[in-house]
Curated annotation (Swiss-Prot):
The lineage of its organism: Bacteria, Pseudomonadati, Pseudomonadota, Betaproteobacteria, Burkholderiales. GO terms for cellular component: cytoplasm. Belongs to the endoribonuclease YbeY family. It is an enzyme of class 3 (hydrolase). It is found in: Cytoplasm. This is Endoribonuclease YbeY. Binds 1 zinc ion. The keyword Zinc applies. One of its GO terms (molecular function) is zinc ion binding. Its EC number is 3.1.-.-. It comes from the Bacteria. Its cofactor is Zn(2+). One of its GO terms (biological process) is rRNA processing.
Amino acid sequence: MTLHVGAEPAPREEEIAEMADEPRELEFDLSVQYGDEVTGDVRKACPKRKLIAEWIEPALFSSAQLTVRFVGEEEGRTLNDGYRHKDYPTNVLTFAYDPLPDGTVIGDLVLCCPVVEKEAQEQGKPLAAHYAHLLVHGALHAQGYDHETSEEDAAEMEALEVAILAKLGFPNPYQ
């Protein structure tokens, strides 16, 4: 789920194709945070900064300043309730802000560790694959992609996720 705070619309397929042909000299500033509930084995199971960057970079179509925050159920529920009026924790929330004048994307990705772990187990996926998917998903949201506006937008976002994850060596998360 994305919460847009004046964020620009996402680049469309034609623009992405053009960008793919151009040399990419993107800057990526990544900050990683852990909520108070994320300790011990839960924190150890979270992907480390280098891996997070490796998974997000292929999903970036412009320079970005992103914060990835790993939280527990209480903080996840509080954020989801406060911003989406849904009183339960969700796997990932993306807060997208107005880009900088040079087009740099700014956003916060919040991942609720217990929810991510439970979903990975229920879906029979490696935890790393599920985290990679949600980080790519959140990074696309931060750039304006949205799967809730139309079926066409959802299909476009899903296709991008599948292609990016395949480049990273992960299977299609929707199968």
